[in-house]
Amino acid sequence: MLAIAVTVSAVTAFAVSPTRRSFAIVTEPQTFKHCSAELEKYREAVCTDGLDAFICVNDWSCPDELRDSLKTYYRNRSLAGAVFVGDVPIAMIRKAQHLTSAFKMDEDGAFPMRESSVPSDRFYDDFDLKFDYVCRDTSETNFFYYNLAPESPQYISCDIYTGRIKPSVKRGDPYGEISRYLLKAAAAKSGRNPLDHLVSYSGSGSFSNSLAAWKDETITLKEQMPAAFSSSDGAKFYVFAMYPNMKDILLKEIARDELDLVLFHEHGVPERQYLTDIPEPEDIDGYYTDARYRLRRQLRTAAGRGQDTEALKAEYIKKYGIPSAWLEDWDDPKYEVEDSLYDAATGIMLDDVVKTAPNVRMAIFDACYNGDFREDDCIASRYVLSDGKALVGIGNSVNVLQDKSSSDLLGMLALGYSAGEWMQQVNILESHILGDPTFHFTAPEGAAKPDLYSTDINYWKKYTDAKYPCDIRGLALQKLFTLDAPGLSDLLMKTWKSSDEYMLRLQCMHLLAHYNDGNYSKLLKDGADDPYEFIRRKSTFYLGKVGEDWMADELAAVYMRDYNSLRVAANVGFVCAHFADSLFLKNFDRRLEEAAWVYDKDSFREKAMATFSLACSIESGTGKIFTDKNARGKNFYISGMRNNPYPQYAMPLLSLVKDNSESTALRTECAEVLGWFVRYHGRRELISAITDYLESGTSMPREVRDELVKTKGRLEYYTR
């Protein structure tokens, strides 16, 4: 261990006052050897900014060693956060997919461990989580695999915040990248920079391309960052269809010196941001060019899969009535180059970022895999490690839910809280800071900035007053939730009814889901007719997950009045089958019959059934596995209940868990799937039934018992 827990200057990091928090700059010997001067400059800047920073150098043998050190600093040195610089071990988490927003991949052999695990620094910043070590990767030896332990808390509540500064080795200058970044991060701490310029972009495919879903962000961001709305160029909102070439516009935007924050809502992979589809043709020549391009692309894809391209060409000629000349050049290298450029115009790639040298200080990537730091390089890292003034990238290490709120408590940034302090409140398993987690914008003079470390319930109740900004009130409600404040359910309901602030009311919705006292169901009924589309969308979705009988009629009413809001209508379709005996369809048919304003009822129903039919078909197939022991597709339907936890099948699913005639693998999977019933209206009874079974003395396989213990913990977190 080299210089662990000490600084490399004459100033010792052990002199930490009780009111002054510390910050660990964690690295390994090679990075320290090449970047020691820059690490020290960064440390000094962090100290000047208000934290007692220290450099921690070690040849880390495994993540547990580092985690134990961080725990010690947290107990003894008031550790606030840490940044991992260089080649610091990566914890690859398994058996914890419920802590992600969307990631679901078979962990039992169908996929490699590398792909079916989640790279996550929650291993380092949430000390209450418990893990069982699995193994070390034999080829990428900095990867260490862990299962979330059955006895662990089944939710995330970070004790500290973390970030990563991880360079690309393949680009040839990893230590230079680190050194240059540390110097610019240090320099940035000496200036004033309020958050008063932002850009938001929604890419093709985000929110089903629904303008009803897109438009409300102008309201929510104004609630959270009002200073950005005080000038003509302070807040800009783009959507993929605005201009023919959005890529050029966005590259110019992120290069603006005054830009503080950009939010990307898009699809992504580690090396690319998907911005748009191929632009719509504007004339006959454009349609001709576009058609040939698409056919060439399909043929190349088919060739890559080993398919018969000659047979496929003949099929296209017959199907579309086109001449063979349209297809003769599909494998011409000249057209391959041209087509690659055509495709490149639809996204931002790593090299585009390098050439642009972004100056936007913070970029939030509400996208899949843009923050996947297990790879040599990723979009979020490349933004901050390029030559511009970019300092922080917030990205996800795996895929992420499209219908996820990505701006909860985001107003904390405008009030001077650091990127790490904000993310500590909203982290999920896959979300990460790439860059300096201590970076913060300059707070407005006189801004309210409560002490995040207070555990005084009365202190936080004070900040629920309407005179405070919406995200300070939202933060206070979250702190009261963490402290298990008495009467919080009623306070959340009161705030929900009295506030007209979208983001504060959304926070009430998030937190009230954990109470099983009837208030949440009332909120969902109100929320299904809310002016904020996201609240309508999620209320619709959760009405099905709760699954009380009266909610079937409420969902039918939602569809009838809001079917033109594409994401709302889609969410009705997702959950319309979460009721027994086709209850939703019966209510829908009745409401349609009573709707005098619908001129052509047959056409209306036909279009609606296109939204409902798939869900109804899957539910029907699922039901058969409980009545027919030899039903086909049993594993498919059981696995599908992770996305579709049908309330009507909760107790039958537990019966399968108890059935000794079923295989251990199937019983274990059923036990795990029950953990997705966190909003089920009968979850208290479900918890009681699980507890009775666990305590009955009945013999059961260890795998089944472990999964039931985990499921019970998951359900209890939503049953205050």
Which ranges hold each PLM region?
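Bacterial Sec-dependent N-terminal signal peptides
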Residues: 1-18
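Structured catalytic cores of large enzymes
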Residues: 64-244, 253-261, 270, 276-283
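Loop/turn elements at helix/coil->beta-strand transitions in domains of secreted/extracellular proteins
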Residues: 19-23, 48-53, 77-81, 192-198, ...
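Caspase-like cysteine protease fold
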Residues: 406-494, 498-510
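Structural detector for internal amphipathic alpha-helices that build alpha-solenoid repeat scaffolds
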Residues: 471-483, 503-515, 536-548, 567-582, ...
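Catalytic cores of nucleophile-dependent amide-cleaving enzymes
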Residues: 117-180, 289-405
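Short inter-helical turns and helix N-cap capping residues of alpha-solenoid HEAT/ARM repeat scaffolds
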Residues: 468-469, 500-501, 531-532, 562-565, ...
